[in-house]
Protein backbone atom coordinates (compact mmCIF):
# COMPACT_ATOMS: atom_id res chain seq x y z
CA UNK A 1 0.00 0.00 0.00
CA UNK A 2 2.92 2.31 0.69
CA UNK A 3 4.09 2.31 -2.92
CA UNK A 4 0.55 2.76 -4.24
CA UNK A 5 0.53 5.96 -2.19
CA UNK A 6 4.02 7.04 -3.28
CA UNK A 7 3.19 6.42 -6.94
CA UNK A 8 -0.03 8.45 -7.14
CA UNK A 9 0.14 10.90 -4.22
CA UNK A 10 1.38 13.80 -6.34
CA UNK A 11 -1.25 13.45 -9.10
CA UNK A 12 -4.00 13.13 -6.49
CA UNK A 13 -2.97 16.02 -4.26
CA UNK A 14 -1.82 18.37 -7.02
CA UNK A 15 -4.05 17.22 -9.89
CA UNK A 16 -7.26 16.21 -8.13
CA UNK A 17 -7.25 18.55 -5.13
CA UNK A 18 -5.34 21.35 -6.89
CA UNK A 19 -2.88 22.11 -4.09
CA UNK A 20 0.50 23.74 -4.69
CA UNK A 21 3.64 21.59 -4.98
CA UNK A 22 5.06 23.11 -1.77
CA UNK A 23 1.93 22.19 0.17
CA UNK A 24 2.12 18.68 -1.29
CA UNK A 25 5.68 18.42 0.03
CA UNK A 26 4.47 19.38 3.50
CA UNK A 27 1.64 16.83 3.38
CA UNK A 28 4.02 14.11 2.16
CA UNK A 29 6.42 15.01 4.98
CA UNK A 30 3.59 14.94 7.53
CA UNK A 31 2.59 11.45 6.40
CA UNK A 32 6.23 10.37 6.66
CA UNK A 33 6.35 11.76 10.18
CA UNK A 34 3.36 9.58 11.11
CA UNK A 35 5.23 6.54 9.80
CA UNK A 36 8.33 7.46 11.82
CA UNK A 37 6.32 8.00 15.01
CA UNK A 38 4.55 4.65 14.78
CA UNK A 39 7.86 2.92 14.04
CA UNK A 40 9.27 4.37 17.27
CA UNK A 41 6.13 3.40 19.22
CA UNK A 42 6.31 -0.09 17.71
CA UNK A 43 9.94 -0.50 18.83
CA UNK A 44 8.97 0.45 22.39
CA UNK A 45 5.93 -1.85 22.38
CA UNK A 46 8.05 -4.81 21.24
CA UNK A 47 9.52 -4.82 24.76
CA UNK A 48 6.06 -5.59 26.20
CA UNK A 49 4.22 -7.43 23.43
CA UNK A 50 5.10 -10.28 21.10
CA UNK A 51 6.05 -9.08 17.62
CA UNK A 52 3.36 -11.28 16.09
CA UNK A 53 0.72 -9.47 18.16
CA UNK A 54 1.99 -6.10 16.95
CA UNK A 55 1.92 -7.34 13.37
CA UNK A 56 -1.68 -8.53 13.77
CA UNK A 57 -2.58 -5.14 15.24
CA UNK A 58 -0.87 -3.32 12.37
CA UNK A 59 -2.62 -5.40 9.72
CA UNK A 60 -6.06 -4.95 11.29
CA UNK A 61 -5.50 -1.21 11.67
CA UNK A 62 -4.26 -0.98 8.07
CA UNK A 63 -7.47 -2.56 6.78
CA UNK A 64 -9.62 -0.27 8.95
CA UNK A 65 -7.69 2.90 8.09
CA UNK A 66 -7.53 2.06 4.37
CA UNK A 67 -11.30 1.51 4.49
CA UNK A 68 -11.73 4.98 5.95
CA UNK A 69 -9.35 6.37 3.32
CA UNK A 70 -11.46 4.79 0.59
CA UNK A 71 -14.75 5.95 2.17
CA UNK A 72 -13.60 9.51 2.90
CA UNK A 73 -11.95 9.66 -0.51
CA UNK A 74 -15.43 9.22 -1.98
CA UNK A 75 -17.37 11.63 0.23
CA UNK A 76 -15.05 14.23 1.72
CA UNK A 77 -12.57 16.80 0.60
CA UNK A 78 -8.88 17.17 1.15
CA UNK A 79 -8.87 17.38 4.96
CA UNK A 80 -10.95 14.25 5.63
CA UNK A 81 -9.05 12.26 3.03
CA UNK A 82 -5.67 13.38 4.36
CA UNK A 83 -6.53 12.52 7.97
CA UNK A 84 -7.53 8.98 6.97
CA UNK A 85 -4.51 8.66 4.68
CA UNK A 86 -2.18 9.83 7.47
CA UNK A 87 -3.32 6.99 9.71
CA UNK A 88 -3.22 4.46 6.87
CA UNK A 89 0.41 5.36 6.12
CA UNK A 90 1.26 5.43 9.83
CA UNK A 91 0.11 1.83 10.34
CA UNK A 92 3.07 0.76 8.21
CA UNK A 93 5.20 1.60 11.25
CA UNK A 94 3.79 -1.52 12.89
CA UNK A 95 3.99 -3.72 9.80
CA UNK A 96 7.28 -3.03 8.00
CA UNK A 97 9.73 -3.25 10.93
CA UNK A 98 7.88 -6.16 12.54
CA UNK A 99 7.88 -8.31 9.40
CA UNK A 100 11.59 -7.62 9.03
CA UNK A 101 12.20 -8.55 12.68
CA UNK A 102 10.26 -11.80 12.35
CA UNK A 103 12.08 -12.76 9.15
CA UNK A 104 15.49 -12.04 10.66
CA UNK A 105 14.64 -13.86 13.88
CA UNK A 106 13.50 -16.97 12.05
CA UNK A 107 16.60 -17.07 9.83
CA UNK A 108 19.28 -15.71 12.17
CA UNK A 109 22.01 -18.01 10.81
CA UNK A 110 21.48 -16.63 7.33
CA UNK A 111 20.56 -13.07 8.24
CA UNK A 112 22.42 -11.50 5.32
CA UNK A 113 20.75 -13.75 2.77
CA UNK A 114 17.38 -13.42 4.51
CA UNK A 115 17.69 -9.64 4.48
CA UNK A 116 18.58 -9.62 0.78
CA UNK A 117 15.67 -11.90 -0.12
CA UNK A 118 13.26 -9.89 2.02
CA UNK A 119 14.38 -6.63 0.39
CA UNK A 120 14.07 -8.18 -3.06
CA UNK A 121 10.56 -9.43 -2.32
CA UNK A 122 9.44 -6.12 -0.80
CA UNK A 123 10.66 -4.07 -3.73
CA UNK A 124 9.33 -6.58 -6.27
CA UNK A 125 5.86 -6.32 -4.75
CA UNK A 126 6.26 -2.53 -4.53
CA UNK A 127 7.21 -2.36 -8.20
CA UNK A 128 4.22 -4.49 -9.17
CA UNK A 129 1.82 -2.38 -7.09
CA UNK A 130 3.27 0.83 -8.54
CA UNK A 131 2.87 -0.55 -12.05
CA UNK A 132 -0.73 -1.60 -11.39
CA UNK A 133 -1.87 1.73 -9.93
CA UNK A 134 -0.18 3.54 -12.82
CA UNK A 135 -1.61 1.19 -15.45
CA UNK A 136 -5.14 1.52 -14.14
CA UNK A 137 -4.88 5.29 -13.59
CA UNK A 138 -5.60 5.26 -9.86
CA UNK A 139 -5.75 9.05 -9.74
CA UNK A 140 -8.68 9.71 -7.42
CA UNK A 141 -8.68 9.64 -3.62
CA UNK A 142 -11.22 6.83 -3.40
CA UNK A 143 -9.29 4.69 -5.90
CA UNK A 144 -6.11 5.11 -3.85
CA UNK A 145 -8.02 4.13 -0.71
CA UNK A 146 -9.44 1.08 -2.49
CA UNK A 147 -5.96 0.11 -3.74
CA UNK A 148 -4.51 0.44 -0.25
CA UNK A 149 -7.35 -1.63 1.21
CA UNK A 150 -6.80 -4.36 -1.38
CA UNK A 151 -3.08 -4.43 -0.55
CA UNK A 152 -3.86 -4.58 3.18
CA UNK A 153 -6.31 -7.45 2.71
CA UNK A 154 -3.83 -9.38 0.58
CA UNK A 155 -1.17 -8.81 3.25
CA UNK A 156 -3.50 -9.98 6.02
CA UNK A 157 -4.49 -13.06 4.01
CA UNK A 158 -0.85 -13.96 3.37
CA UNK A 159 -0.16 -13.47 7.07
CA UNK A 160 -2.98 -15.85 8.01
CA UNK A 161 -2.06 -18.47 5.44
CA UNK A 162 1.74 -18.40 5.63
CA UNK A 163 2.75 -17.08 9.04
CA UNK A 164 0.05 -17.12 11.69
CA UNK A 165 -0.28 -20.92 11.82
CA UNK A 166 3.46 -21.32 12.52
CA UNK A 167 3.79 -18.65 15.22
CA UNK A 168 3.22 -18.92 18.91
CA UNK A 169 1.07 -16.14 20.28
Task: Give residue ranges: language-model regions.
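Helix-to-loop junctions at the C-terminal end of transmembrane segments
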Residues: 38-52
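Small-residue hotspots at the loop-to-helix junctions and early N-terminal turns
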Residues: 21-29, 115-116, 145
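Transmembrane alpha-helical segments of major facilitator superfamily
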Residues: 26-35, 122
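Conserved extracellular-gate-facing transmembrane-helix segments in secondary transporters
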Residues: 1-6
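A late C-terminal transmembrane helix in Major Facilitator Superfamily
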Residues: 101-142, 147-148
